[in-house]
Swiss-Prot record:
<dbReference type="InterPro" id="IPR037094">
    <property type="entry name" value="Glyco_hydro_38_cen_sf"/>
</dbReference>
<keyword id="KW-0812">Transmembrane</keyword>
<dbReference type="InterPro" id="IPR013780">
    <property type="entry name" value="Glyco_hydro_b"/>
</dbReference>
<comment type="similarity">
    <text>Belongs to the glycosyl hydrolase 38 family.</text>
</comment>
<feature type="signal peptide">
    <location>
        <begin position="1"/>
        <end position="21"/>
    </location>
</feature>
<dbReference type="GO" id="GO:0016020">
    <property type="term" value="C:membrane"/>
</dbReference>
<dbReference type="GO" id="GO:0004559">
    <property type="term" value="F:alpha-mannosidase activity"/>
</dbReference>
<dbReference type="InterPro" id="IPR015341">
    <property type="entry name" value="Glyco_hydro_38_cen"/>
</dbReference>
<dbReference type="InterPro" id="IPR050843">
    <property type="entry name" value="Glycosyl_Hydrlase_38"/>
</dbReference>
<feature type="glycosylation site" description="N-linked (GlcNAc...) asparagine">
    <location>
        <position position="38"/>
    </location>
</feature>
<feature type="glycosylation site" description="N-linked (GlcNAc...) asparagine">
    <location>
        <position position="675"/>
    </location>
</feature>
<feature type="glycosylation site" description="N-linked (GlcNAc...) asparagine">
    <location>
        <position position="990"/>
    </location>
</feature>
<keyword id="KW-0479">Metal-binding</keyword>
<feature type="binding site">
    <location>
        <position position="150"/>
    </location>
    <ligand>
        <name>Zn(2+)</name>
    </ligand>
</feature>
<dbReference type="GO" id="GO:0005764">
    <property type="term" value="C:lysosome"/>
</dbReference>
<feature type="binding site">
    <location>
        <position position="409"/>
    </location>
    <ligand>
        <name>Zn(2+)</name>
    </ligand>
</feature>
<feature type="transmembrane region" description="Helical">
    <location>
        <begin position="1073"/>
        <end position="1093"/>
    </location>
</feature>
Length: 1123
């Protein structure tokens, strides 16, 4: 090898070594914390290189914090036992040793930091209330400023809810990269956020946005290997850049990250060194102060500066570059993106079964809270009963904590490791069983009024049980009491369904089943449909659905008797719907008082006639799947994938018809046994007893119900689509945020996944043509993602699973191949009608009656029907919460959903109503939304604001504004000695009157106490007759394990969780780069050497060949010349 070649090789190796060293330094984030000595010469050099940061002196608030997820890569208990307890103990020790140090914990004061796209407003309010109440009870502290820095986008309901809880300022973080870049350049990182146009300033709050993320700035991170000189230089550059992105001179800098400060002493010690250098040189940087601080201190300083500058002239503010107004933002921050291919829209749907179970468990919790509270109130004169019931209060609060826990932004989203989600699923199951027990006991204390009736207190009187399937086998001589609970403040008349099982397929036996309303002794119409006609399906053999129309009083209970009649003279009003096998789905139509529904040959909807308006619309209902290898638990990415048709050709059509229900069931993937891969159930509810010309349709008649049961298909993201032919909606559609509808615009410059938005209750389209004013709404039973990809089309994602990760933190694929049973509800109506009805329909769907069952022969002494309200609430006032807090204080929330005609709302009050029928209450006080003292933000109306029309988010504002509408007035009156605010206001018969006014889209909260009649309380002594006793642990785990999600379900609920602890074999980017840095030059070198060798071999071979040829010629010549 010559000298030149050797030099070249050495050069290549040297470049590789330098490159490798550089890469290692970039990627190494786990160096031990190192202390450095102060070097005055180096510091002088830093100050010479950096100029002044800003003309106006800066106040810098350093926010030490640790973002501790309650479940993500590890479960709740692991995080606490291995990390969190050490963070807390270390921090407390550091704060005790040095009063200058500060630390920020619990962030928003809630039980968790909730997600904002998939958690319902009821659940958000619950988790916030649980945290705020705990802080007040335990530490006597009330949250005023919040730190909501990790949800993946922000809902417009947040400023509305938070401001109603007394929160005045909010720090946010995960705003789309392009939006945040604009906010920085326009100096709009601080702004006023308005949550609702109808509430105006009442829903506004001051918001500050983090520049990058909630972690340490790079150069001052104690885990990063920088010298003191580099730390100071990097920090000063950081604050210079930071100060140029906002109007104010008040800067907030986070010092922390996920689960930081497990060694609090070391973290503070590193920060102490560079902080001292900055503090000693404040004047050189125009720094007024720099210190450890809390969020409260930062916002108070920020507010003071804004108030001070708003009092100055424009000329004075121009000298400091300060605009005299703050930007007013009235939209939301969805979808969240971190790049063109990274739109975080997949988690809107990820883990659909878990999302459904969370919502279902939340409704059960609401029922438990209401019934327990009413049981306490109704037994206020019996000390023994009160004492017994109060033993359930700890269980009740723990169950609320579980509901609060699963609202975390990595649980309800489905973006945790699978074993973590399984842990939360088990917690939900435990809370459900506990709530079954609480409801059972509360029902006993509410309905069993004859305490002296031994027959109702002995062992033969079974408790109220949760029965997912009522087993009527061998029950000819017995009957069941079915008690339905209505959690709504309105009277309910609607269809309900429940499952039964008999011991044989006996039509005569089935037709002998009867349902009787207990209070009227009236036999009511029922319709029975078999769930499966195949006798090979033993798990659901002889399982049937029973349909009925029931009446429930507001917030009340009604009892129905279910039995098999053995009396030949008795004539049950029962219809057994026999199955009819169809060759095609278009052989039949559905009809009820509201709609006529026609189907395609594959059984999916093709045309709907609205009988109220005689409007006929072609509706194309289809299922589709996106195939992709780029998506993950967070991100939905269609790049490189295709959209395919799905569930296009059923194997079997089964039709059932009757007086209450028409149902078409389609089975897919049918084998010789009972297994099917997918099920679709089309259903319409009917009530042939009413005269449509004079009576309103039942609320269940106002939609066409589509049920489906599908498995997760690998690397598929499944949607259901409704396309209304000839509908022009100009790319505008609407989704609800739980409080109100928000306007969305489909951007055709972006891909479909970039146009997805979260849906909590419904998605809808409205016709924009002058000749038509119809609205088309699809209601959902859980949180989903949805969009409108073309005129007249609504696309809803219903399931997704993949064997790839999106590398946004979970570091494991979301392999959810489990079955999801769900329902969607399609409605078409006039826009004005839906203005009155859409929210009520959504609330009815999400607040279905809850049924409990008691098997016994004697109902003596039991109330058969019960309601605590003297009248139902006005049609636009929703009773959102009724629950018992500590010390028997009761919390009440009322929500004005504004579902009334806007033309009449401004001129008339809603119905006047007393609150409770017989229960006496006192200390009726209006509170904040988390039941703490009501506080008003006295600064919010003093800010001068402007709307920036250039802001890059172009949709997400309120659909309607009712800011000028008259509030609804509700008059609550109560007998006796009430101590209500404005207690002097007395009406007839010495009743205390309280008038409450609630604005459209406003939630108002109150606390009160039941009046315990101490002079009437029965003492706890042996002279008292047998008391009702608490029934404990009567629900077996197996019952919950064998629960069916819906009446049509073939398969019990079975989530597919798996053990994904540890590291996933993801692509190692560091190794990849190192291998490229080594492999590329080495590969080139090898190729060059190989080419040289080949060249030399060929050259030698050519030379040798030439020599042989020459030799042959010589030999030939010699041969020719020889004699």
């Amino acid at each position: 090898m010559n000298k030149t070649k050797l030099i070249k090789i050495i050069f290549v190796i040297g470049v590789w070594i330098l490159l490798s060293t550089f890469i290692i330094n970039i990627y190494n984030e786990n160096f031990e914390i190192v202390n450095y000595n102060n070097n005055s010469q180096s510091l002088k050099k830093i100050f010479q290189l950096n100029g002044d940061l800003k003309d106006e002196k800066l106040s810098i608030f350093l926010i030490p914090h640790s973002h501790c997820d309650s479940g993500w890569l590890q479960d709740y208990d692991w995080y606490y036992n291995h990390v969190v307890q050490y963070i807390l103990s270390g921090i407390v020790n550091e704060l005790n040793l040095d009063k200058e140090k500060k630390f920020n914990w619990v962030e928003i004061g809630g039980w968790v930091q909730n997600d904002e796209a998939t958690a319902t407003i009821d659940d958000v309010i619950t988790q916030m209330t649980q945290g705020h109440q705990w802080l007040k009870d335990t530490l006597n502290y009330t949250i005023e400023y919040a730190w909501q820095i990790d949800p993946f986008g922000y809902s417009s309901s947040t400023p509305t809810i938070f401001s109603s809880m007394g929160i005045k300022g909010l720090i946010i973080n995960r705003v789309s990269d392009d939006v945040k870049s604009y906010m920085k350049s326009a100096k709009e990182m601080e702004f006023i956020w308005k949550g609702s146009e109808s509430l105006g300033e009442q829903s506004q709050m001051l918001v500050s946005t983090l520049n990058v993320h909630y972690d340490y700035p790079k150069h001052i991170d104690p885990k990063k290997d920088f010298s003191l000189e580099e730390r100071v230089k990097g920090f000063t550059k950081y604050i210079k850049d930071l100060s140029n992105t906002r109007e104010s001179s008040i800067l907030m800098i986070p010092l922390g990250d996920d689960f930081r400060y497990s060694n609090a002493k070391n973290e503070f010690s590193v920060s102490k060194e560079w902080l001292k250098v900055i503090q000693d040189n404040k004047e050189k940087y125009n720094i007024k102060e720099i210190k450890y601080a809390t969020i409260d201190e930062y916002f108070i300083a920020l507010e003071d500066e804004f108030m001070n500058k708003l009092g100055k002239t424009v000329e004075e503010n121009l000298k400091t570059g300060f605009s005299s107004t703050l930007s007013l933002y009235n939209k939301d921050f969805f979808p969240y993106s971190t790049g063109d291919l990274e739109y975080w829209t997949g988690y809107y749907t990820t883990r659909p079964l878990l999302k459904r179970l969370i919502r279902e468990s939340s409704l059960l919790q609401k029922s438990s809270d209401i019934l327990y509270t009413l049981a306490i109130g109704e037994n206020s004169n019996n000390q023994i009963d009160i004492n017994n019931l109060q033993t359930l209060s700890n269980q009740l609060n723990e169950n609320r904590n579980t509901i609060a826990l699963v609202q975390h932004h990595d649980i309800v989203t489905g973006t945790s490791r699978s074993f973590v989600l399984n842990d939360n699923f088990q917690r939900l199951q435990k809370s459900r069983i506990s709530n079954y027990n609480i409801i059972s006991n509360s029902l006993e204390y509410l309905l069993n009024k004859d305490n002296n009736n031994n027959e109702n207190t002995d062992s033969t009187n079974e408790p109220f049980n949760f029965e997912n399937v009522i087993d009527l086998s061998n029950e000819i001589n017995n009957q069941y009491s079915l008690v339905f609970h209505n959690t709504l403040g309105w009277e309910v008349n609607q269809h309900v369904s429940f499952r039964i099982k008999v011991n044989k397929n006996d039509n005569q036996l089935l037709e002998s089943i009867q349902l009787v309303e207990a209070i009227s002794n009236k036999t009511i119409q029922i319709q029975i449909i078999p769930i499966q006609d195949d006798s090979n399906c033993q798990s659901i053999e002889n399982n049937y659905i029973v349909f009925a129309i029931i009446n429930l009083p507001p917030l009340g209970l009604n009892t129905y008797y279910l039995s098999i009649s053995s009396n030949e003279d008795s004539k049950p009003n029962t219809i057994l719907s026999k199955p009819k096998l169809l060759k095609k789905g278009n052989e039949i139509n559905f009809n009820n008082n509201r709609f006529k529904v026609e189907f395609e040959s594959n059984g999916l909807i093709s045309k709907i006639t609205d009988k109220n308006s005689n409007e006929i619309k072609t509706i194309e209902q289809t299922f589709h799947q996106y195939s992709t290898k780029k998506s993950g638990p967070y991100i939905f990415n269609v790049k490189g994938g295709k959209k395919h048709g799905f569930l296009e050709n059923p194997d079997k059509f089964i039709y059932h018809d009757g007086p209450l229900v028409s149902q078409l069931t389609m089975l897919y993937g049918v084998d010789d046994g009972c297994n099917v891969t997918s099920i679709v159930v089309q259903r319409i509810y009917k009530n042939n007893e009413i005269d449509n010309s004079n009576s309103k349709s039942l609320i269940t008649e106002n939609y066409i119900e589509t049920g489906y049961s599908i498995n997760g298909d690998m690397n598929r993201e499944t949607t259901i689509n409704y396309k209304v032919k000839d509908l022009e909606n100009d790319d505008i559609f609407y989704t609800d945020n739980g409080l109100e509808s928000r306007k969305r615009i489909y951007n055709h410059d972006r891909t479909v996944n970039q146009n997805y938005y979260p849906v909590l209750g419904y998605i809808k389209l409205k016709e924009t043509s002058e000749n038509n004013n119809h609205q088309y709404t699809v209601y959902v039973d859980r949180s989903v993602g949805a969009t409108s990809p073309s005129d007249g089309e609504m696309e809803i994602m219903i399931h997704r699973t993949m064997d790839t990760d999106d590398w946004k933190g979970v570091n494991w694929p979301s392999k959810d191949i489990g079955r999801s049973d769900a329902k969607l509800y399609f409605n078409m109506d006039l826009v004005n009608n839906q203005l009155q009805n859409e929210k009520r329909i959504s609330l009815h769907i999400t607040n279905q009656p809850i049924m409990f069952v008691k098997k016994h022969n004697n109902q003596t002494g039991y109330l058969l029907k019960y309601s605590p309200l003297s009248n139902q609430l006005p049609s636009n006032i929703h009773l959102q919460s009724l629950l018992t807090l500590k010390n028997n204080t009761v919390g009440l929330r009322l929500f004005n959903i504004h579902e009334v005609d806007s033309n009449t709302q401004s001129t008339t009050d809603t119905d006047k109503s007393t609150l409770f029928n017989e229960l006496e209450i006192s200390n009726f006080i209006e509170t904040g939304l988390s039941f703490l003292k009501l506080t008003k933000n006295n600064l919010i109306d003093k800010y001068s604001t402007r709307i920036n029309k250039k802001f890059p988010v172009k949709c997400g504002e309120s659909e309607y504004s009712f800011i000028n509408e008259k509030p609804s007035s509700i008059i609550f009156s109560n007998n006796g000695t009430n101590n209500i605010i404005d207690g002097e206001n007395k009406g007839e018969n010495n009743k205390t009157i309280e008038t409450i006014q609630i604005k459209p889209h406003e939630i108002k909260s109150f606390t009160f106490n039941f009046n315990f009649q101490l002079d009437q309380i029965i003492p706890n002594n042996n002279n008292y007759a047998i008391n009702k006793e608490l029934n404990n642990e009567y629900i077996e785990q197996s019952i919950e394990n064998q629960r069916y999600e819906y009446d049509f379900s073939f398969f019990p609920i079975k989530p597919t969780f798996y053990d994904d602890r540890g590291k996933y074999n993801r692509p190692n980017h560091l190794a990849l780069i190192l291998s490229l840095s080594i492999g590329t030059p080495a590969g080139i070198l090898i190729i060059v050497i190989a080419l040289v060798v080949i060249y030399k071999k060929r050259k030698n071979r050519k030379t040798l060949t030439s020599s042989y040829s020459l030799l042959n010629l010589i030999l030939k010549d010699r041969a020719d010349s020889s004699p």
